[in-house]
């Protein structure tokens, strides 16, 4: 292949290249650009908020407008900037380079993930153009307000579901890439710390995102068809919504933080000219955060009336998680201590982070104490705290990463003076914006108030100071945009390694070529700093044979599939459910998946090197299944809580056990048939393989038909909008039915690939992933039979 080939010049050629690319670097650039655009947009929203609060009794915004802008500010900053920039933006661009790989494990899935992410942003913002306007319920969309509001909540909920699907695919892809595509000789303990941070954040997100998905799905079901778990009128519990929501939304603070801690550590090591202090301890601290991060969510709920023991337990774990977080902070400080500091722009952001994050950490430990939390709950003290952690923590980390990798991403240097001016404006503006808010919290100002009276002591003066600080931040944002524009327009060309970095991305050109590396990488990795080690040992890097370089083909179908799925969610949000348009777009989405599955990923057969010996599809699906298990687990846990508390009482007339046993026979039998079909494929017996796969599909169709008939009968003989047990049955069993459809469609794709000859002895197409997913569907069904039909 011609490894120097470039897309044709011209606007349409460039646009087509972006729509069809599967190159991890281009996708990383698109993620990064979109995320920082979201940051700028959220910044504009914040200026509108602070303008409204600058003086008492201001009429710049109405209460409804203020609530809408506040909701979009929080959602845009958290979901579309902080998570995405550090994890999917820099991660997509840098992680394969750091691992010495040509691309991610699943390139087309990666492209689909980006376009779905972009669709989620558009979906959230387009609510402005529909009756009711943008959502005004806050980014937390607390029940019951979110169930009753007539604003654009449906669009917001649909956007969260689409974004969640994108995130899960992206996270599974990262973990599969890290496990499978490391350079030969690079063990897990020789990976750069940023790769470890992406791994930790991805694992945590895969496990915890189920909480947000469950909360979002259940509120959307109540809004669209009246199926409620949280409505007290039918025995539901509104606090259960908070349990679901915060089970994700506090762990996601660490998803927002971990990648940036990795970035800051990389920057500190490079500009201190010394190895990372306590590398192994930092890795263990990251994994400790992953474990403890799932045990702290309920500190957001100290004031909802839970038991004293409940509050003490979560207060303990909230304080405990400060230990691994503090370890990572001291690792960064220890790396800088005694180093030959090169005071470049990225390092300024590291130093600013250390001071501000320490302040945020101290106030976080304060809030873990239940008496103080009672005092400060929903006050501006909390607002200042989480901006300390996220704005001056993750936000500063994002700019450290942007300035650090900007020369590698763009091939251009930037004006150091402008970069430093940007930093100082942000630091001063941040401190002036949020330090007064701690005082406002002490003085009792609640968050989310759109105005206040002039006679409340201290409020007018402190709010004015905070608003002045916000405008200084805005000025810093303008300097940042100008710095980037000037660099792209006339910045000096960047050398391959402008900072003297030690990790593998600095071995590539600036910007990297399509195939990433021109040289054959050595198989010895003495430490996480291979460039330093190889230079010290005098290792000679030999050119790679172009015949050994294989890149995936571009494809239109990931973009098409994401676009049709986006259109499906628009139809769900904008129209009553069900409606004809949602079925039309769902059919178009299925068509895109068929075309995707039948398209060749590579121009000719390629033998992939994987560290684990498992295929990329196997590894990606294994980790995606973690998220699916989490989703069913949290819904089933919620159902068991309602059932054991006596709120969800089964009706006298329930679905028949004999039908469930018949379906169990069909589904369990299909697990055996798909297993033996896969076994036949491995032995090269293609006719028995195709027959076994066809039998599996038929059994799945029979299961779905029996289940549909049962649903139809029970639907017409039950008060499903008034009985909590029935609502839980339709939710969980219906969700399982959706998974049967998804799994069955995956098997159909594999069967079509088999008929086309795409599945061979060495290329199993989508079969491996589809069969694994099918076994999950079967296992979940056995649990469902036990808790709904037998019990």
From Swiss-Prot:
Its EC number is 7.1.1.9. Cu cation binds at residues 250, 254, 299-300. It is found in: Cell membrane. One of its GO terms (molecular function) is heme binding. It catalyses: 4 Fe(II)-[cytochrome c] + O2 + 8 H(+)(in) = 4 Fe(III)-[cytochrome c] + 2 H2O + 4 H(+)(out). Residues 1-473 are annotated as: COX1. SUPFAM superfamilies: Cytochrome c oxidase subunit I-like (SSF81442), Cytochrome c oxidase subunit III-like (SSF81452). It comes from the Bacteria. Fe(II)-heme a binds at residues 73, 387. There is a cross-link at residues 250-254 (1'-histidyl-3'-tyrosine (His-Tyr)). Keywords: Cell membrane, Copper, Electron transport, Heme, Hydrogen ion transport, Ion transport, Iron, Membrane, Metal-binding, Respiratory chain, Translocase, Transmembrane, Transmembrane helix, Transport. Residues 545-791 are annotated as: COX3. It is a multi-pass membrane protein. The chain crosses the membrane at residues 29-49, 78-98, 111-131, 155-175, 201-221, 244-264, 282-302, 312-332, 347-367, 381-401, 423-443, 464-484, 566-586, 617-637, 657-677, 691-711, 729-749, 771-791. CDD domains: Heme_Cu_Oxidase_III_like. Binds 1 copper B ion per subunit. Binds 2 heme groups per subunit. InterPro entries: Cyt_c_oxase-like_su1_dom (IPR023616), Cyt_c_oxase-like_su1_sf (IPR036927), Cyt_C_Oxase_1 (IPR000883), Cyt_c_Oxase_su1_BS (IPR023615), Cyt_c_oxidase-like_su3 (IPR000298), Cyt_c_oxidase_su1_bac (IPR014241), Cyt_c_oxidase_su3-like_sf (IPR035973), Cyt_c_oxidase_su3_a-hlx (IPR013833). Heme a3 binds at residue 385. NCBIfam families: CtaD_CoxA. Possibly a heterodimer of A-protein (contains: cytochrome c oxidase subunits I and III) and subunit II. The A-protein could also present a precursor form of subunits I and III. In the N-terminal section; belongs to the heme-copper respiratory oxidase family. Cytochrome c oxidase is the component of the respiratory chain that catalyzes the reduction of oxygen to water. Subunits 1-3 form the functional core of the enzyme complex. Co I is the catalytic subunit of the enzyme. Electrons originating in cytochrome c are transferred via the copper A center of subunit 2 and heme a of subunit 1 to the bimetallic center formed by heme a3 and copper B. This cytochrome c oxidase shows proton pump activity across the membrane in addition to the electron transfer. This is Cytochrome c oxidase polypeptide I+III. It comes from Thermus thermophilus (strain ATCC 27634 / DSM 579 / HB8). The lineage of its organism: Bacteria, Thermotogati, Deinococcota, Deinococci, Thermales. The gene is caaA.
């Amino acid at each position: 292949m011609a490894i120097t080939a470039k897309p044709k010049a011209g606007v349409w050629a460039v646009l087509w290249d972006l729509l069809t690319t599967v190159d991890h670097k281009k996708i990383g650039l698109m993620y990064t650009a979109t995320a920082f655009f979201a940051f700028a947009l959220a910044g504009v929203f914040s200026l509108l908020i602070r303008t409204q609060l600058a003086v008492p009794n201001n009429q710049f915004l109405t209460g409804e407008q203020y609530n809408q802008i506040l909701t979009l500010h929080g959602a845009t900053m958290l979901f579309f900037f902080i998570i995405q920039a550090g994890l999917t933006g820099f991660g997509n661009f840098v992680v394969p380079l750091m691992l010495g790989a040509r691309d991610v494990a699943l390139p087309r899935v990666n492209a689909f993930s980006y376009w779905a992410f972009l669709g989620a942003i558009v979906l959230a913002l387009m609510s402005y153009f529909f009756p009711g306007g943008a959502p005004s319920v806050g980014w937390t969309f607390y029940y019951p307000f979110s169930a009753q509001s007539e604003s654009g909540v449906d669009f917001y909920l649909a956007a969260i579901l689409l974004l969640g699907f994108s995130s899960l695919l992206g996270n599974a892809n990262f973990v599969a890439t890290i496990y499978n595509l490391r350079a030969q000789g690079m063990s897990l303990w020789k990976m750069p710390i940023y790769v470890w941070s992406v791994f930790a954040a991805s694992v945590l997100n895969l496990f915890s995102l189920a909480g947000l998905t469950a909360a979002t799905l259940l509120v959307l079901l109540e809004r669209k068809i009246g199926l409620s778990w949280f409505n007290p009128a039918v025995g539901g519990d509104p606090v259960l919504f908070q349990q679901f929501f915060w089970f994700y939304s506090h762990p996601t603070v660490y998803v927002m933080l971990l990648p940036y801690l990795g970035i800051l550590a990389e920057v500190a090591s490079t500009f201190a000219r010394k190895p990372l202090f306590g590398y192994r301890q930092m890795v263990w601290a990251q994994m400790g955060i992953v474990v403890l991060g799932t045990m702290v969510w309920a500190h957001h709920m100290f004031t909802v009336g839970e038991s004293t023991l409940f509050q003490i337990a979560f207060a303990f774990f909230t304080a405990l998680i400060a230990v691994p977080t503090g370890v990572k902070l001291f690792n960064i400080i220890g790396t800088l201590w005694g180093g030959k500091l090169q005071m470049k722009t990225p390092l300024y952001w590291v130093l600013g982070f250390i001071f501000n994050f320490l302040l945020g950490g101290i106030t976080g430990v304060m809030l873990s104490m239940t008496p103080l939390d009672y005092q400060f709950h929903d006050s501006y003290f909390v607002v200042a705290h989480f901006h300390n952690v996220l704005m001056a923590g993750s936000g500063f980390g994002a700019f450290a990463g942007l300035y650090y990798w900007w020369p590698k991403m763009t091939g251009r240097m930037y004006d150091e003076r402008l970069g430093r001016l940007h930093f100082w404006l942000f630091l001063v503006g941040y401190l002036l914006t949020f330090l007064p808010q701690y005082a406002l919290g002490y003085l009792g100002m609640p968050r989310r108030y759109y105005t206040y009276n002039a006679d409340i002591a201290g409020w007018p003066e402190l709010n004015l100071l905070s608003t002045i600080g916000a405008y200084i931040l805005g000025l810093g944002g303008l300097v940042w945009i100008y710095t980037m524009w000037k660099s792209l327009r006339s910045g000096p060309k960047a050398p391959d390694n402008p900072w003297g970095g030690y990790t593998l991305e600095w071995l590539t050109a600036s910007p990297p070529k399509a195939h990433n590396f021109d040289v054959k990488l050595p198989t010895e990795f003495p430490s996480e700093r291979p460039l330093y080690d190889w230079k010290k040992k005098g290792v000679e890097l030999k050119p790679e044979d172009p015949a050994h370089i294989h890149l995936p083909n571009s494809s239109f179908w990931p973009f098409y599939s994401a676009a049709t799925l986006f259109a499906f969610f628009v139809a769900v949000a904008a129209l009553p459910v069900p409606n004809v348009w949602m079925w039309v777009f769902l059919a178009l989405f299925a068509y895109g998946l068929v075309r995707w599955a039948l398209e060749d990923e590579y121009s000719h057969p390629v033998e992939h090197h994987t560290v684990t010996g498992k295929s990329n599809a196997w590894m990606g699906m294994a980790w995606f299944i973690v998220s699916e298990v989490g989703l069913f687990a949290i819904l089933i846990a919620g159902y068991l809580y309602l059932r054991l508390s006596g709120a969800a009482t089964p009706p006298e007339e329930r679905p028949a056990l004999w039908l469930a046993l018949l379906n169990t026979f069909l589904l369990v039998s299909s697990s055996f048939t798909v297993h033996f079909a896969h076994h036949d494929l491995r032995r090269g017996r293609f006719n028995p393989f195709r027959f076994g796969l066809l039998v599996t599909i038929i059994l799945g169709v029979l299961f779905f038909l029996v289940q549909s008939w049962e649903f139809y009968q029970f639907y017409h003989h039950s008060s499903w909008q008034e009985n909590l047990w029935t609502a839980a049955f339709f939710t969980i069993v219906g969700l399982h039915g959706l998974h049967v459809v998804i799994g069955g469609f995956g098997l159909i794709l594999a069967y079509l690939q088999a008929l086309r000859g795409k599945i061979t002895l060495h290329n199993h197409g989508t079969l491996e992933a589809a069969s694994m997913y099918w076994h999950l569907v079967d296992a979940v069904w056995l649990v469902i039979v036990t808790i709904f039909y037998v019990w």
